[in-house]
């Protein structure tokens, strides 16, 4: 199937609009630029990282259906690419159904993955995939009842994990070890949710050995059919639900790897179905899984590049961002690994506007390393402001070098 791309800022332009313009969106935009695509970066605040590199920058409340509709109808992009969850997804479905725009991977996928309830019910109840035991709760009292089993269903018990139904980067997530933690966890979830839903998911704790992200790509083959391919598994470490380092490849037993791929294929095949039921959805998905021995449990999925996948900037022939850009444009993809590597997060360390970074030269002196400083206009002590990536002959060396490089970067108030 021949693919034609135009010239930016001309009548022939191929136009892509990103809804959400953080550090991951910024890398997608750069990948699209390299393919000659005209880009529009949308976010809720001015000077978001992706807006700094796009042809056009727009600032709206993306959860407002009227604002979202007006912008898409005015700009008329060929593709709309959601990069965050807090979007008026029913409006995207309406616009897609009307033929106004094509949503990546589909408007249905954007709706189902906008919060943890939609995707968990799809995975566990519709597809029958293995997950942790879970319940959705609308109050601290319901949360306590779900943990104790006094709601007429099997007890979730302690330890358990509570998360807002909509949040990002671990915000509002906590582990509960006993009854004294319940009210604190509820309050923390309410403060950390991206949109005020007043609803949480409580999950029974799985005694896993490690967790992975399996980047899964749905892309057009030469005959026009959509084929699924997988990157090598990415291991990662989280603190309070927030990724702090990742590495690739994560060694896995063959049976566990096959089960992980089967789960990822099942959920992405379903999310790839459009409103008409056709398997038309294209793009990259980040599928999060828990692993213990040969056992694998589904955790979450994002229909877009994943923060732990920043490591692919150092490891793959095509990073997750290049894979996403190619897949959504109908171009061939290559998920092969080039070399082992790792990533380590650089936190802001200070609450300030327009921070400066010292130690960049020292960081880049570490062998095989590179940096991404995201350009976020405002820093917080625990806000992710950059990442160090490292390539090496083995994962352990790459992890050590990525941590060393990240530690040498010193953000400060300018």
From Swiss-Prot:
Enzyme class, first EC level, given as a word: ligase
Listed EC numbers: 6.3.1.21
Domain ATP-grasp: 121-329
Gene3D superfamilies the UniProt entry points to: 3.40.50.20, ATP-grasp fold, A domain, ATP-grasp fold, B domain
GO terms assigned for molecular function: ATP binding; magnesium ion binding; phosphoribosylglycinamide formyltransferase 2 activity; phosphoribosylglycinamide formyltransferase activity
One CC-aspect GO term: cytosol
InterPro entries linked: ATP-grasp, ATP-grasp_carboxylate-amine, ATP_grasp_subdomain_1, PreATP-grasp_dom_sf, PurT, PurT/PurK_preATP-grasp, PurT_C, Rudment_hybrid_motif
Binding site residues for N(1)-(5-phospho-beta-D-ribosyl)glycinamide: 23-24, 83, 307, 376, 383-384
Keywords: ATP-binding, Ligase, Magnesium, Metal-binding, Nucleotide-binding, Purine biosynthesis
Binding site for ATP: 116, 163, 168-173, 203-206, 211
UniProt binding sites for Mg(2+): 288, 300
Coiled-coil intervals, chain numbering: none
Functional note: Involved in the de novo purine biosynthesis. Catalyzes the transfer of formate to 5-phospho-ribosyl-glycinamide (GAR), producing 5-phospho-ribosyl-N-formylglycinamide (FGAR). Formate is provided by PurU via hydrolysis of 10-formyl-tetrahydrofolate.
Subunit structure, as described in the record: Homodimer.
Similarity field: Belongs to the PurK/PurT family.
UniProt name for this protein: Formate-dependent phosphoribosylglycinamide formyltransferase
């Amino acid at each position: 199937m021949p693919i034609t791309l135009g010239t930016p800022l001309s009548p022939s332009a191929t136009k892509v609009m990103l809804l959400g313009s953080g550090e991951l969106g910024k890398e997608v935009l750069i990948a699209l630029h390299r393919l000659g695509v005209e880009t529009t970066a949308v976010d809720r605040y001015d000077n978001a990282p992706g807006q700094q590199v796009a042809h056009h920058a727009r600032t709206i409340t993306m959860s407002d259906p009227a604002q979202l509709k007006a912008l898409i109808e005015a700009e008329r992009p060929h593709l709309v690419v959601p990069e965050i969850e807090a979007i008026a997804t029913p409006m995207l479905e309406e616009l897609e159904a009307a033929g106004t725009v094509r949503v990546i991977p589909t408007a249905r996928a954007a709706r189902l993955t906008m919060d943890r309830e939609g995707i968990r019910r799809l995975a566990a109840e519709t597809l029958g995939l293995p997950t942790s035991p879970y319940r959705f709760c609308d109050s601290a009292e319901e949360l306590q009842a779900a943990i104790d089993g006094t709601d007429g269903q099997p007890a979730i018990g302690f330890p358990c994990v509570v998360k807002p139904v909509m949040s990002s980067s671990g915000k509002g997530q906590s582990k509960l070890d006993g009854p004294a933690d319940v009210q604190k966890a509820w309050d923390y979830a309410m403060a950390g949710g991206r949109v005020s839903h007043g609803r949480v998911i409580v999950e029974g704790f799985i005694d896993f050995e490690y967790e992975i992200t399996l980047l899964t790509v749905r892309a057009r083959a030469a005959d026009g059919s959509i084929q699924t391919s997988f990157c090598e598994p990415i291991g990662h470490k989280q603190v309070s639900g927030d990724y702090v380092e990742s590495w690739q490849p994560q060694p896995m037993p063959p049976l566990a790897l096959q089960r992980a791929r089967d789960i990822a294929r099942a959920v992405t095949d379903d999310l790839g179905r459009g409103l008409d039921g056709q398997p038309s959805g294209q793009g990259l998905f980040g599928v999060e899984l828990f692993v213990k021995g040969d056992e694998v449990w589904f955790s979450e999925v994002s229909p877009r590049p994943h923060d732990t996948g920043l490591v692919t900037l150092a490891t793959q022939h095509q990073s997750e961002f290049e894979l996403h850009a190619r897949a959504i444009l109908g171009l061939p993809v290559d998920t092969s690994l080039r070399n082992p590597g790792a990533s380590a997060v650089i936190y802001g360390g200070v609450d300030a506007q327009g921070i400066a970074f010292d130690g960049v030269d020292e960081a880049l002196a570490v062998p095989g390393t590179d940096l991404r400083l995201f350009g976020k206009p405002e820093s917080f002590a625990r806000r992710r402001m950059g990442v160090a990536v490292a390539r090496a002959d083995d994962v352990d060396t790459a992890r050590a070098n990525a941590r060393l490089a990240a530690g040498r970067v010193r953000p400060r108030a300018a």
